[in-house]
Amino acid sequence: MRPPGLMPSAWACDGHGPVAPLRTWTKVGPDLLALQAGRVDVPLWCPLPLLPGWTVTGLAVAGDERAGGRATALALSGPSPLGGPADLVLVAEELGTGLGGRTAGTMALDPGVSVSTAPDAKVQAAGHPTPLWLVDSAEDRVAVAGEAGGVWLWAVLWPPAAVLLLLEHVELHDLRHETHAGMTLPVGAPTSRL
């Protein structure tokens, strides 16, 4: 990873070219959520109401002050439907950003979703039915992706059986919306997933 300089003026990766710098936070409170929600150009998705026992465990934003936030990731933890703990990271990103692929454990910049088959899961995103398809991921997790709000939406879950959470009626809300200003969400132990 090379920092910006006079030429080029963007962060750069030898394998991917220009990339958006990534900032992560493991202590997420209402002030931080409100501040970052006001700085990003893509949705900051959160399932509301939270599933019973679920907490917010981290936040990541890819982008800089000049270009704005090109991707967001909100990490949550709670009980898995089959017992034990589970983690969920919701990523919203512009085309070619790569945060979703990184979270899924692949080198993919975009999910490469094939919509020629029936979706593997469905959620409500900002009140709109949103189909999601299984995409490539590392073996220790499962990832689904689709389009919501004009950008990619990824849901990455650990362990893979936690994908059963998406069989529930999941409503994703964009925390950038003014109705969510000042909302206090339960905060859990910091995540290692970001």
Spans of model-derived segments:
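Short, solvent-exposed recognition patches
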Residues: 55-134
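A short, solvent-exposed beta-edge/loop patch
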Residues: 116-194
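N-terminal, charge-rich interaction modules
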Residues: 39-40, 54
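Proline-anchored loop/turn motifs at beta-strand termini and strand-loop-strand connectors
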Residues: 46-56
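N-terminal cysteine/histidine-rich coordination modules
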Residues: 1-38
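Short, solvent-exposed coil/turn segments at beta-strand boundaries
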Residues: 51-53, 80-83, 147-152
